[in-house]
Amino acid sequence: MAGKRSGWSRAALLQLLLGVNLVVMPPTRARSLRFVTLLYRHGDRSPVKTYPKDPYQEEEWPQGFGQLTKEGMLQHWELGQALRQRYHGFLNTSYHRQEVYVRSTDFDRTLMSAEANLAGLFPPNGMQRFNPNISWQPIPVHTVPITEDRLLKFPLGPCPRYEQLQNETRQTPEYQNESSRNAQFLDMVANETGLTDLTLETVWNVYDTLFCEQTHGLRLPPWASPQTMQRLSRLKDFSFRFLFGIYQQAEKARLQGGVLLAQIRKNLTLMATTSQLPKLLVYSAHDTTLVALQMALDVYNGEQAPYASCHIFELYQEDSGNFSVEMYFRNESDKAPWPLSLPGCPHRCPLQDFLRLTEPVVPKDWQQECQLASGPADTEVIVALAVCGSILFLLIVLLLTVLFRMQAQPPGYRHVADGEDHA
């Protein structure tokens, strides 16, 4: 009986201690999403240019070259709907200007893509409907002139050091081998298109034009066979790698994609410490923007970013109170975004590790790093000019000294001429 009473006492004591712990210890904080940054490419567009022998010139396209099509508008509306579903419970179901900020490059296609995306993300509810027959509301999209854009329009320039790196890239074995392997092919394409200055770096324009025409049901010329299109596509992907990789990728990143990455890092840090930014920050830009950023992050898959593809940064606060970053890439509309892992970090990357690992590709002073370093020849010229300048300076000082002494010397004795008046 005593043993039974002792067992009950121990059980009661255990329950009491558990109750005290529940009262004294704070509840565990659940992991929560705090901030999202999106970078997406515009939707389907018309070609940005054509070639001399192309039977389809600019008048073939309703709005001309480089413009968003109806297909492109739909792609971004659907992306907006997908984002609305993904961030249900994080974003308000209706648009609140304090929650969202959108910036675009100053191109019609990126501005219109952002607007179509926002139409899918924030359809008007209740009082936001200014017309019962229109399920749309205006939401601001911010931009700066193309010539002033140092954040989203790539490649960034003018940057002499970047141009020097590109010249050095052209001398690498990989570039030289690619050039020699495709010399005859490029000659054939140049002859068929009427282009006279076709290179590894410009042939992407031909592929882009043919791809847009094929996508919109226009008949391609006989020379643009499936094999030719496949080869052009591969060279198009090579041109992206030429812009941001192949040679000195880390330094190129500091001069290109690292500039945008620096802003993203700054925003992540700010939201982890002060929460002073909107919950959703959106950049509407181009395939070159995505490739530049992903090359800086070293997560580029080697292929052109498709229309309406979207790179996602999500900042989480863990139950420990620390912050982590997760990245995703949505490049297929019928599939969930692909998880991306920064090299050297798990997919759920602690914020401090994310900042540490990306630090080497972020410029300290972009303007300064874009300047050309003085080479040996430049140093010799500078030294020679300095020596010549010093000699010239000494000669001038010597000459002035002699002249000063001559003027300061008192006049000597002389005979007075006959008939000369005395003072």
Curated annotation (Swiss-Prot):
Gene3D superfamilies: Phosphoglycerate mutase-like. It is a single-pass membrane protein. The chain crosses the membrane at residues 381-401. GO terms for molecular function: acid phosphatase activity. Disulfide bonds join 159-370, 212-310, 345-349. Pfam families: His_Phos_2. InterPro entries: Acid_Pase_AS, His_Pase_clade-2, His_PPase_superfam, Histidine_acid_phosphatase. Residues 31-380 are lumenal. Glycans are attached at residues 92, 133, 167, 177, 191, 267, 322, 331. Its EC number is 3.1.3.2. Its main location: membrane. It is found in: Lysosome membrane; Lysosome lumen. Residues 1-30 form the signal peptide. It catalyses: a phosphate monoester + H2O = an alcohol + phosphate. One of its GO terms (biological process) is lysosome organization. Belongs to the histidine acid phosphatase family. It is linked to Lysosomal acid phosphatase has been shown to be deficient in cultured fibroblasts from patients manifesting intermittent vomiting, hypotonia, lethargy, opisthotonos, terminal bleeding and death in early infancy. This is Lysosomal acid phosphatase. It comes from Homo sapiens (Human).
